[in-house]
Regions:
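Short, positively charged and aromatic/hydrophobic N-terminal segments
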Residues: 3, 12-14
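Long hydrophobic alpha-helical segments typical of transmembrane helices together
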Residues: 202, 214-216
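Nucleotide and nucleotide-moiety/phosphate-recognizing core
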Residues: 17-167, 172-194, 207-214
Length: 216
């Protein structure tokens, strides 16, 4: 099992402050929220839209935050760059691709717009794991979590090649790059409850935003 960085805290903080200048962040907000029935990114959480919490969390990691969406009027006020979605639309794979294409730094954190409980420490650790790899992707059981991951800009071309072949699954390009899977027992050391990877897909999931749930 990968051990969490044991360097003295001051040295680790200094390392992360330097890293912030070389990390981009990409928020995927191009979905149609059909199962939710309304825009998931704008759902209220603690008095603010979820996407506002997401962007604020990412500010601790990056000086280059992009929201991938064709709705600049909705997401522009949250203080991130707005990047038009891939055309023709092809789901999250296209969103990640255009985000990487416009990223200002070689490495990017990618998250979905409906993840209210992002854990900065976990994301920093995933970034730290990226040395020598093109993609660092947590797993839940045997399933990858590609919308809470770290990718290099070099992933852009393999992604587009897969899209041009008709692929839509984000994981389709993993065989074409240097992949670092992160098994569940590893990342749960930093997030035992697994809250960071929670996203909201249906109205029933909104119960997770109630105080008894998010204070657990």
């Amino acid at each position: 099992m990968h051990k969490f960085d044991a360097r003295p805290q001051a040295e680790y903080d200094r390392f992360m402050n330097e890293s912030q200048q070389s990390i981009s962040a990409i928020v995927l907000a191009g979905g149609q929220s059909r199962r939710m029935g309304r825009d998931k990114a704008l759902i209220d959480y603690q008095g603010r839209p979820i996407i506002a919490h997401v962007v604020d969390t990412l500010r601790a990691l990056s000086d280059d935050i992009a929201v991938v969406s064709n709705q600049s009027d909705l997401y522009g006020p949250f203080g991130a760059r707005i990047v038009p979605d891939y055309e023709p639309p092809c789901g999250p794979l296209g969103g990640i691709a255009v985000g990487l294409q416009t990223a200002r730094h070689p490495l990017a954190v990618v998250v979905a717009c409906d993840m209210p409980f992002l854990n900065v420490t976990l994301l920093r650790w995933l970034i730290d794991l990226a040395e020598g790899y093109d993609a660092v992707v947590p797993q839940t059981g045997d399933e990858f979590e590609p919308l809470h991951a770290v990718y290099r800009r070099e992933c852009y071309s393999p992604m587009v090649q897969r899209i041009e072949r008709g692929e839509r699954r984000v994981i389709s390009f993993f065989a074409d790059v240097r992949l670092r899977p992160v098994p569940e027992p590893e990342w749960r050391v930093l997030d035992p409850a697994g809250r960071s990877l929670v996203n909201l897909n249906t109205p029933d999931d909104l119960d997770l935003l109630s105080p008894p749930a998010y204070n657990r």
